[in-house]
């Protein structure tokens, strides 16, 4: 049966995903940045309270995936922390200035991760040549690749996703970006074995008092009275699609 991974930004979201049928969680912070490394406090509390597999993301900032020496040193420390806390896997990715997998740095990450299953995230979609990148990641021993098929969403990238799957059994190709219950069947019919979804939406803050005269963000237009949350019903609906597909 296909595996359902849900992207979560808090312990509450992780518990919601677990209760509604998620098989695995990608744990992140900062949804507006596309997902950054969670704090140590979040890592510890999720590790204590969530029973299903949780793979934290290792990403020190938003933007591109070509990191300074200082940023990369911090990434290695975060990898070691995730390993020490007992997580079964992690999610990360590093590119060089030419849009290739940074082999030297990824080798260091793989060594620091040890037995943990490593997912190469959507830095893959920013690679100059996805097929060369896939071969490099296979040689490194990366467990899976999260990809939208180098398109803005995985529906439009499905032809490339299918080509990547046809390259071999490893790494596993996990489709993500815009995957929802209403289009999930297309991925299952195409032979995708793992799917990734945020399965959520922005929700209004419970704050009653709101000072609209200033912003804590460098983006003055940012809505600071909203937060991203996993929708349990959406997770359950996606799981139902997978179960029904397996039964047919």
Curated annotation (Swiss-Prot):
Does Cytoplasm count among this protein's keywords?
A: yes
Coiled-coil regions listed: none
One GO cellular component from the entry? cytoplasm
Keyword match Cytoplasm:
yes
Give UniProt keywords alphabetically: Cytoplasm
Which cell locations does it reside in? Cytoplasm
Q: Which GO terms describe its molecular function?
A: copper ion binding
Family, according to the entry, reads as follows: Belongs to the CutC family.
Q: Which PANTHER family does the UniProt record give? A: COPPER HOMEOSTASIS PROTEIN CUTC (PTHR12598), COPPER HOMEOSTASIS PROTEIN CUTC HOMOLOG (PTHR12598:SF0)
Q: What NCBIfam families would the database entry show?
A: PRK11572.1
Q: What is this protein called?
A: PF03932 family protein CutC
Taxonomic classification, please?
Bacteria, Pseudomonadati, Pseudomonadota, Gammaproteobacteria, Enterobacterales
């Amino acid at each position: 049966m296909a595996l359902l991974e849900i992207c979560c930004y808090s312990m509450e979201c992780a518990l919601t995903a677990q209760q509604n049928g998620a098989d695995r969680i990608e744990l992140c912070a900062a949804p507006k940045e596309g997902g950054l490394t969670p704090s140590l406090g979040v890592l510890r509390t999720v590790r204590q309270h969530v029973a299903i597999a949780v793979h934290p993301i290792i990403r020190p900032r938003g933007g591109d995936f070509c990191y300074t020496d200082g940023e990369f040193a911090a990434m290695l420390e975060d990898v070691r922390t995730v390993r020490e806390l007992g997580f079964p896997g992690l999610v990360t990715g590093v590119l060089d200035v030419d849009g290739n997998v940074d082999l030297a740095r990824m080798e260091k990450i793989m060594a620091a991760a040890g037995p943990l299953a490593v997912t190469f995230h959507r830095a893959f979609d920013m690679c100059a040549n996805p097929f060369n990148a896939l071969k490099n990641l296979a040689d490194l021993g990366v467990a899976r690749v999260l990809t939208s098929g180098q398109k803005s969403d995985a529906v439009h990238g499905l032809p490339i996703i299918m080509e990547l799957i046809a390259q071999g059994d490893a790494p596993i190709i996990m489709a993500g970006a815009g995957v929802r219950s209403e289009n999930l069947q297309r991925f299952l019919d195409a032979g995708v074995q793992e799917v990734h979804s945020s399965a959520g939406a922005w929700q209004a803050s419970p704050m009653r008092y709101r000072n609209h005269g200033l912003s804590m963000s460098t983006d003055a237009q940012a809505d600071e009275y909203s937060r991203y949350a996993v929708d349990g019903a959406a997770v359950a609906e996606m799981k139902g699609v997978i179960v029904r597909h397996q039964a047919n």
